[in-house]
Amino acid sequence: MKKLLLTASIICLASAGLAEENPTPVISNSDTEIKLEGFYLFESGYIKQDHLILFDKNVTDNRKKLGFYTEAAFAATISKTINDVIAGAKIVLQPTTRVKTSASYNGSHIFIETSYGKVELGSPVDASAKLRVTGSQVTAGTGGWYRYALLDGQYMRYNGLKPDFDTSASFYLESYSNSFDQINEKTEKARRLNFFTPKMKGFQAGISYTPDTANTGGNKDINNLTLESSGRNGVSVSRTGIKTVSLGNGETMTINQNIRDAFSAGLTYEHEISEDADLKLSVTGEYGKPARRLVHAKMEGTKVIEVLNTYKLSNLKAYNLGAVFTYGNFSCGASYGSLGKSLTAKEYYKVGRDTYYYNGAVAYGQGPIKTSLEYLKTSRYKNTVDAVSLATEYKIMPGLLPYAEISHFQAKGKPVYYPEAPSKTTRGTVGLIGTKLKF
């Protein structure tokens, strides 16, 4: 019943918005404005992948090869303007399906905007994520092949340990530390302070400060791995940003990928070369200190009985360079990003410590139809992913966008703790058909 009411509400709001060229419903008076915006995605995915064993072949609990996926977002922005100062709040509601967490739906926060710039208080999306440019920004479809692929299945493991892979061009602060999958409460990611300058002659800059990436919207602290004698038992309940891997013989490595005193910044430049040609350039980066050390421990069940050693993790240092060029109906985009040796230690990351990615895409749009081709290459600790995606979409009306997409991928690598392990490869093809609704 709740899902039916939510669907009816979205359809009613969307119908009002889609009738206009600007599909965002707005309620306003002389100095107060309320803007409603939302997104819903329905997608069906089919996959064919080699070297999958037993239940690794299942896309869902009881079905191989075929699965459905949904994603949603709904937000209300309330703002008031007094003497050229805009103050307000954006409140993002938790939907009944998987929440969309892109920078375009910049979660719940307070904002104050003047002619000198915009301040965001409590935003879960940092400046580098909002200002970063990648090749995928010009593509059709969703690029969501990774939702159906299994790159670390049983065949790819060694001594029970999984290899690490990257499937997108992203940074630590938005993907590695805190995601909704790692948070028990229905909250957003870490709280931040953001500042963005106004656009001046095509330039815009932004900077963010995050005191602790474990400080999410629903908790104020987090307990790391400790001994029984300290009065705290084991690891934190929420385990936000923490993963523990088993090395056998009762030994584990606990890696806390949370960051303290994290800064992210970005600079973009937009230039209209001619009536038909536009260029956008971006440089973004992140810096921060690891919250804790890597812990090598002896465990009995879920209890730590002895800490064998601790190792220092390297600082977070990451950057991304990106560009998008548009000429008439053609668009192309490219980006390169490096995370270096961020949050690694040689005692565990024995195969390799560097992470980088690059991607490029070309797109052509004619009327309501858009078609694109994208290539992505990632390397995480010398484990590589190559993916090529061909996608097309058709705009039925403003805000309603059916699409189809086919992707071929290859992942090659081994667990980072075992340099003696053989490097293994898995390949596959994913077909997607879906519909996006924005209002």
From Swiss-Prot:
InterPro entries listed in its UniProt record: Gram_neg_porin_domain, Porin_dom_sf
GO molecular function: porin activity
Keywords, comma-separated and alphabetical: Signal
Keyword Nuclease: no
Signal sequence region: 1-19
Cellular compartments per GO CC: membrane
Name recorded for this polypeptide: Uncharacterized protein RF_0053
Protein species of origin: Rickettsia felis (strain ATCC VR-1525 / URRWXCal2)
Organism phylogeny: Bacteria, Pseudomonadati, Pseudomonadota, Alphaproteobacteria, Rickettsiales
